[in-house]
Amino acid sequence: SYVFRNSQHAADRFGLADAGNIYGRLTNSTQDVFEKRIAALEGGVAALATASGAAAITYTIQALAQAGDHIVAQKTIYGGSYNLLAHTLTQFGVNTTFVDAHDLAQVEAAIQPNTKAVYLETLGNPNSDIPDIDAIAAIAHKHGLPLVIDNTFGTPYLIRPIEHGADIVVHSATKFIGGHGTTLGGIIVDSGNFDWKASGRYPNIAAPNPSYHGVSFADAAGPAAFVTYIRAILLRDTGATISPFNAFLLLQGTETLSLRIE
């Protein structure tokens, strides 16, 4: 926990009226610096660091899809992500259609009335195939859906998916961002560009949320609504929190990212 000046200060923090540390499971000062640096590198408005890349991906899908919902995903993705979508999340009522991301007609045809996101990787793992991000972003947005991209292999040094239409970018920071094999971590970057209210598909983010004092995250956090929702609800309840020391180690890796990618 953190020290508050008085009860009003605490109430403002918990009510999202005043930005800052609330509770150690949600954020810490070292984590905050790491989040801001990766958000800046990706061109996003905010970010949320997690204990692993798998946690970042899982939280992202859980924030978008609930029981009865559907995801469209590139079929050539990291095996852990494939298993999450193909097997684990189906136990919670979220189903995925895997598509050839190079066949734009197939991508669009896979979208259903209950689809909540399109999911890609900038460089597919392990094939290193590169989808047409701009074209798929246009398809997703045409249907009122956010485009989620795993940029672990691409890194923001080589490509910034938000500039090509991605709405949410995720990383396993364990890989190129960390770079030294010393620590685990993940991160979710919010572009701030997706209109959660206009879409009408995401009441957990856009409407008053009964799990958080009736706050609408779209109203309270504005462009950073997506990662704020995950921090306040999913991280609070399930706790895949990055430790301050792991955030420090990932900051050290970020310092040399460009040199190592070169």
PLM features per residue range, with description:
Residues Y2-F4:
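Short polar catalytic/cofactor-binding loops
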Residues N6-T58, G80-T88:
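Conserved N-terminal alpha-helix of the aminotransferase class I/II PLP-enzyme fold
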Residues A47-E262:
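Conserved PLP-enzyme active-site core in the AAT-like
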